[in-house]
Amino acid sequence: MKEKSKNAAKTRREKENGEFYELAKLLPLPSAITSQLDKASIIRLTTSYLKMRAVFPEGLGDAWGQPSRTGPLDSVAKELGSHLLQTLDGFVFVVASDGKIMYISETASVHLGLSQVELTGNSIYEYIHPSDHDEMTAVLTAHPPLHHHLLQEYEIERSFFLRMKCVLAKRNAGLTCSGYKVIHCSGYLKIRQYMLDMSLYDSCYQIVGLVAVGQSLPPSAITEIKLHSNMFMFRASLDLKLIFLDSRVTELTGYEPQDLIEKTLYHHVHGCDTFHLRYAHHLLLVKGQVTTKYYRLLSKLGGWVWVQSYATVVHNSRSSRPHCIVSVNYVLTDVEYKELQLSLDQVSTSKSQESWRTTLSTSQETRKSAKPKNTKMKTKLRTNPYPPQQYSSFQMDKLECSQVGNWRTSPPTNAVAPPEQQLHSEASDLLYGPPYSLPFSYHYGHFPLDSHVFSSKKPGLPAKFGQPQGSPCEVARFFLSTLPASSECQWHCANSLVPSSSSPAKNLSEPSPVNAARHGLVPNYEAPSAAARRFCEDPAPPSFPSCGHYREEPALGPAKAPRQASRDAARLALARAPPECCAPPAPEPQAPAQLPFVLLNYHRVLARRGPLGSAAPGAPEAAGSLRPRHPGPVAASAPGAPRPHYLGASVIITNGR
């Protein structure tokens, strides 16, 4: 009996083992693996396989007991599936509602160091960090659906991070905690719904399982990752305040690294994506590594780019405490919606760009307009038709100027004048003209200035007023420019550069004629047609520059001929008078506060006794002889009288004087 019982037990064990071996052969595993399985492993793997067939009835081949119908497409599908697992940077796993791992691919050994046989059929809670148990339970729990579905099965997307046990070396595994590695799991929760009593609202659902793909995050050492053209790296503190940025960020977002340093990453993220970034930041601080969702990083000039970041917490090698955050960022798109400005930084940047462009264009225009205004008014040098006589009374009395029209405009341009005289600013306190090449027998300098003239100027004048750069012609120009305009006496010159307007009297009555004359603010003079006017004096030759007095009047009739004769007699008397420039100098007369406007003739300004004060010394009688008289017709046209020569400077030379 004992032998029979021993033999029966042995036979039973052998049959049992044989059945287990036969069952192991039915498992979709290589024979090398199934031949070494124990009974517990075979039962565990078989149970998991049966659950998988319930979840994917059509994905695991034909049912037992049915003839296999293999075709060419089936063999291709099997080969394709094996290739997909090899190319997948991760592993596939299926977890039941109770946490049992129904299936996991053999590629899990590459990332975790754990074999497929060891993991299949066991609870996933045994291989994840204790702090992640609650999260895993929440993932496997389906809340009542918000909308009733007519479909019997539907799926709910899931994306989460787990710290799974890893037995690989820490150097190659990229471990963040002792023995655990962060795995990014993304997939869906499959739910099956059942109808009760054919009522849509009386239904229940069953959680079939979680299907997900686990992916390892990039290692924390940035030297182990090759940065491509669409990637950049930054290092930040634990509160995401940027400390260092790669130079590639300029090409991808427009920001310079110094523009983002010491600023938090939240400041440059689209407002709708800050919640996702905050959630990823929380997971990063808790689990040590995270992969963000796609979020929008604002561009410098407007719009945004889509970015996904792989961040890791770096620990201090000595204290093992969290030190900083290193993130590798993938820019997935070009700048979108460049015209949208969603932050104050973008607005200020665009304004600075516009102001920079405006400043650049303005500076270019200013550089072009900074050329002297007088260069536009340059005229050809006019040759003197009369040979110069050194130190003669003719040249001292002539008062030659380079441009007639500049009596009431800016000082004329001289070929030998220094640049500082040509390029005086509008706010300058200097009021002088360039020196003229006249052979004066004495040193000439700037004209004396009265206090009432520069009442609105600065009290102290520059030292340049003491330099010998003026001329007697400037004395008359200065005093005559400061006199108020009068409707009875106007200035007229026979030059195209004379200030002009449709109403000359209106131009001469400006509130500040000195400033208008200094800066050339008065428009050019346009003389009337020759048929409608004539000059009081015969004009000088076109090539002769003069400072003569001209006044436009209508054509003279017979009644006005005596008046012209009186003017000729006055000129003759002036020519016989001694030159004013040779007279001894006298103290400058003090001009009253308000002076009437006088004629432009220089000899009348300094010689005649009139509104300017006392007459010029040395010619008291000549001043009285300047008053116009009406000589008879015989005296005006005597045949033996010397024929006078008229010059534009109102100086008459008779018999070669």
Curated annotation (Swiss-Prot):
It holds the Pfam family bHLH_HIF1A. Residues 336-657 form the Single-minded C-terminal domain. It is found in: Nucleus. It comes from the Eukaryota. Keywords: Developmental protein, Differentiation, DNA-binding, Neurogenesis, Nucleus, Repeat, Transcription, Transcription regulation. Residues 77-147, 218-288 form the PAS domain. Residues 1-53 form the bHLH domain. The keyword Lyase does not apply. One of its GO terms (cellular component) is nuclear body. PANTHER family: HYPOXIA-INDUCIBLE FACTOR 1 ALPHA (PTHR23043), SINGLE-MINDED HOMOLOG 2 (PTHR23043:SF19). Transcription factor that may be a master gene of CNS development in cooperation with Arnt. It may have pleiotropic effects in the tissues expressed during development. This is Single-minded homolog 2. It comes from Mus musculus (Mouse).
